[in-house]
């Protein structure tokens, strides 16, 4: 019996509407963008709702999806307006939000049913038990921590059916907040 391998989704960052269009035209299956709220890159040229909607419509012509990074760490008072923001994303056709903070995950799940929630790499998921935890809370995909090795990724894949995303190119973070990864690199 021959096992058919699933083709991985090619997911590209898109910092502007022009970059979104180029990524999709050149074969990206999906793009991730930042909105004007709830993202870590608050100083970047993030998308307005109108630009997001235009991007969603453009991507749909190519069979591609648009995800929005909502990966900020919530501080007291940041939650105001989040429910409405997630509902609007869902209503304009955003395929999923990429979230790391449990408060934002809870708000997105309760306020915007039907909007897929992916766990951001910022949440530092490094083992299958963590993936199972987030699955129980309704997340459909987990972006593994960038520090996960290929061997660890393979083992995680064997032990869970949660959809996995992994960075394969680009910037590498070398530390977690409060965790020293330099000593871990000495082990390998």
Residue ranges and their predicted role:
Residues 32-51, 69-81:
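Glycine-rich, proline-tolerant flexible connector loops at the mouths of alpha/beta enzymes
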Residues 9-14, 31-33, 66-70, 97-99, ...:
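Hydrophobic faces of well-ordered beta-strands that scaffold small-molecule active sites
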Residues 58, 64-133:
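N-terminal active-site wall of soluble small-molecule enzyme domains
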Residues 41-53, 78, 100-112, 147-161:
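Active-site-adjacent beta->alpha loops and helix N-cap segments on the catalytic face
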Residues 23, 101, 134, 166:
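Conserved, mostly hydrophobic/aromatic
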Residues 6-32, 36:
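N-terminal basic/disordered segments at the start of proteins
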Residues 14-18, 37, 70-76, 102-104, ...:
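Active-site-proximal loop/turn and secondary-structure-junction residues that shape catalytic pockets
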Residues 187-188:
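Conserved small/polar residues in nucleotide/adenosyl-binding loops
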């Amino acid at each position: 019996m021959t096992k058919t391998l699933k083709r991985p989704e090619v997911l590209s960052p898109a910092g502007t509407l022009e970059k979104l269009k180029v990524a999709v035209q050149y074969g990206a299956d999906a793009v991730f963008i930042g909105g004007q709220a709830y993202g870590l890159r608050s100083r970047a040229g993030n998308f307005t709702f109108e630009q997001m909607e235009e991007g969603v419509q453009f991507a749909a012509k190519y069979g591609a999806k648009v995800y929005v990074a909502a990966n900020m760490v919530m501080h007291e008072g940041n939650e105001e307006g989040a429910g409405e923001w997630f509902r609007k994303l869902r209503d304009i056709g955003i395929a999923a939000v990429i979230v790391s903070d449990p408060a934002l995950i809870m708000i997105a799940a309760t306020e915007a049913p039907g909007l897929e929630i992916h766990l951001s790499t910022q949440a530092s998921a490094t083992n299958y038990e963590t993936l199972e935890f987030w699955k129980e809370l309704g997340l459909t995909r987990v972006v593994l921590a960038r520090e996960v090795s290929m061997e660890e990724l393979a083992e995680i894949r064997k032990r869970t059916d949660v959809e996995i995303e992994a960075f394969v190119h680009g910037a590498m973070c070398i530390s977690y907040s409060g965790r020293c990864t330099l000593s871990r690199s000495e082990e390998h």
